[in-house]
From Swiss-Prot:
This is Small ribosomal subunit protein uS15. The gene is rpsO. The lineage of its organism: Bacteria, Pseudomonadati, Campylobacterota, Epsilonproteobacteria, Campylobacterales. PROSITE patterns: RIBOSOMAL_S15. Belongs to the universal ribosomal protein uS15 family. The keyword Repeat does not apply.
Length: 90
């Protein structure tokens, strides 16, 4: 269920702004997005798993806060990121 190392490295490589960039907002949002997708699939198969549902809500809130920060600081970066991830603009 968790992201394996290879998948994580692919995401980091795709969204990094420079080499060895693992902590930029874009990378963090992309990793959170992938974890959210995995948890959503898990919850479809296990609808009574309430602890995972709470974890999913926390991840969504964390992603929302990071996206809000990016939108506030650099709107062009925000637009590119949500297009790459396929997230709707609120």
């Amino acid at each position: 269920m968790a992201l394996n190392l290879e998948k994580k490295q692919e995401i980091i490589k795709a969204f990094a702004t420079k080499e060895n960039d693992t902590g930029s907002c874009e990378v963090q949002v992309a990793l959170l997005n992938e974890r959210i997708k995995l948890l959503t699939e898990h919850l479809k198969a296990n609808p009574k798993d309430h602890s995972s549902r709470l974890g999913l809500l926390e991840l969504v809130a964390q992603r929302r806060n990071l996206l809000k920060y990016i939108k506030r600081t650099d709107h062009a970066r925000y637009v590119v990121l949500i297009e790459k991830l396929g997230i709707k603009d609120r």
